[in-house]
Structures are given as structure tokens and as C-alpha cells.
Amino acid sequence: MSEWDFAFGLTGQALEDALSTGATYEEWAMIEQELERLIIGDHGKNVFAYIDAENIPSKFWEKITRYISCLVDKWSAKVYALQKDHATMGWHEVAKTNDNVKEIRLCGGPAKNKVDKKIIRDIRRLIGNCTPTETCVFIVSSDSDYRVVVTELKEAGVLVIGIGAAKSNDGYRQSFDQFLELCDG
């Protein structure tokens, strides 16, 4: 790895800034991380991630953690799934091995949007319990059913960041203050 590899992919002013600083890769990465933290600002006091385990596989846990940890130091997550959904059992291991993750398994038979509705109810409850200007919510899903609650959060003054798959539609992506894409590789 060359000391200038960090500049690969940068264009325009960003490339000019990177080359003129004389900073190493590590220093430039730290500068970028601090800039990201400024985006969060006061919203970083209460940070919550709501993960829809039905459409985001547990294999993305490391990327989700990296994305959120680049922006804030302290955060908590809730992972939602149906109790008998074996496809989401990978999230059970994630919750067991991470103190900041709470697993919520919904009982009963499958019903249309059961998990989505529970996540939305919990997010709405959060709005009443936190100071909106000090709160940041990450919604980890590719399901556009969350667009309405994203709008409600933004109107209340909450910073809302989406994390989802590349297949997420443009309207859903644009409803967030920022959208981070999960991709294989």
C-alpha cells in the first residue's frame, strides 16, 4: 500500500485538500472521521439503531457497527424478528455477544408487516421519551414501510440515518437525512 492510496477515488476539492495537507493515510482517515462526527453534532447524545432482521442478514453486523461507530462512540441497538423465523437466528448470536444489542422476538404466527409495525411503534414511543435535537436514529432496513416514521422523526427534529441494501428504492433512500449502503464484499 502506497502512502497516497488514500487519495484514490477522490476528485476535485477533496483530492486537492488531501494532497496539500501532507497528511498520512491514518491522519487523513482521522480527519474524515472527525468531519463525520460534526455531522452528528448534538444529535449524538442519544443514538439508537433499529434493525429489521427480516430483511437485513446478520452477516452485515460488522459493517453496521463500523458505520455507526465512525459517527458516534456510544449507541444501542434493537434487533426485531419473529420468534420462529429460523432465517434470522444469526441475529441471536449477535445479541448474545454484544452488550449494546437487545433482541426482540415477536410471538405468534406471521402476519403482514408484524415486525415493521412493532419497530414503528417503538420508534414513535422514543420520540416522546427523548429530546429530539439530541437524538439520532439509525433504521437498518431496506423496507420502504418506514418512510412515514422517518418523516415524523425528521419533523420532530431527530436526525435519521438509514442503513440498507443496494436494492433500496430511491424514494426510501431520499427520505433519510443520510443513507449508508450495505453491499457484499
Could you tell me what each predicted segment is?
Residues 59-60, 146-149, 171:
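Extracytoplasmic/secreted cell-surface and envelope-processing proteins
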